[in-house]
């Protein structure tokens, strides 16, 4: 009688690449959808946080967004994407609810053929794209944790696993 050990492989998040994001935006006709997608990809905020944003949460001068009552009822400050233009403020608050925004995202991802290159892509993949780009560009994981609003660093560490090139680069620099 032996003991069987089960090994669980954790699925890595599905992240949108910069090319995928550009492809998505090119096929997005509604400005409020473009703004929502830009905020997800450029600031790493969740779909619910995008839908809850108010004009006074965005500080154009300091290029910051105050995310109020994020997951776990926590407030945090995140960067305003460089591509965010003053006229985009007219779209805040976003004119649709979470479900409608996710549906629009899926529809545009299909039309833009993004679903063909990244199967099962969804709005949250924008946030994963933000996080994986941050890690690829050398952002310390504890800074990323703060921006994403994670209470546990192990939640953020998954983005390190998505970037094996970073580990290889660190190895090459050491040896």
Can you say where each PLM-predicted feature lies in the sequence?
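Flexible interdomain linker/hinge and immediately adjacent N-terminus
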Residues: 1-23, 68, 92
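N-terminal DNA-binding recognition helix of tyrosine site-specific recombinases/integrases
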Residues: 1-6, 44-48, 103, 107-108
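Basic, Lys/Arg- and aromatic-enriched nucleic-acid-binding interface segment
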Residues: 14-47
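Short, charged phosphate-coordinating catalytic segments
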Residues: 40-62, 109
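Active-site-proximal segment of tyrosine recombinases
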Residues: 49-50, 121-122, 131, 138-152, ...
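Conserved tyrosine-mediated DNA breakage-rejoining catalytic core shared by Y-recombinases
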Residues: 52-85
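Catalytic-site neighborhood detector that most strongly recognizes the C-terminal catalytic loop/helix
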Residues: 69-72, 148, 153-173
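Active-site/catalytic core of tyrosine-dependent DNA strand-transfer enzymes
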Residues: 81-118, 124, 130
């Amino acid at each position: 009688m032996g003991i069987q050990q089960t090994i669980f492989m954790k699925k890595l998040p599905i992240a949108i690449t910069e090319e995928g994001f550009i492809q998505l935006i090119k096929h997005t006709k509604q400005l409020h959808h473009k703004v929502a997608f830009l905020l997800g990809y450029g600031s790493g905020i969740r779909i619910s946080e995008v839908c809850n944003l108010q004009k006074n949460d965005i500080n154009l001068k300091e290029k910051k967004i105050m995310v109020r009552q994020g997951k776990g009822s926590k407030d945090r400050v995140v960067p305003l994407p460089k591509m965010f233009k003053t006229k985009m403020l007219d779209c805040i608050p976003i004119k649709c609810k979470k479900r409608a925004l996710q549906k629009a995202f899926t529809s545009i991802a299909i039309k833009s053929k993004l679903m063909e290159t990244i199967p099962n892509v969804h709005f949250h993949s924008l946030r994963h794209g933000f996080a994986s780009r941050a890690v690829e560009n050398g952002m310390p994981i504890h800074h990323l944790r703060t921006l994403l609003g994670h209470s546990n660093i192990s939640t953020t560490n998954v983005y390190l696993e998505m970037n094996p090139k970073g580990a290889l680069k660190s190895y090459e620099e050491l040896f």
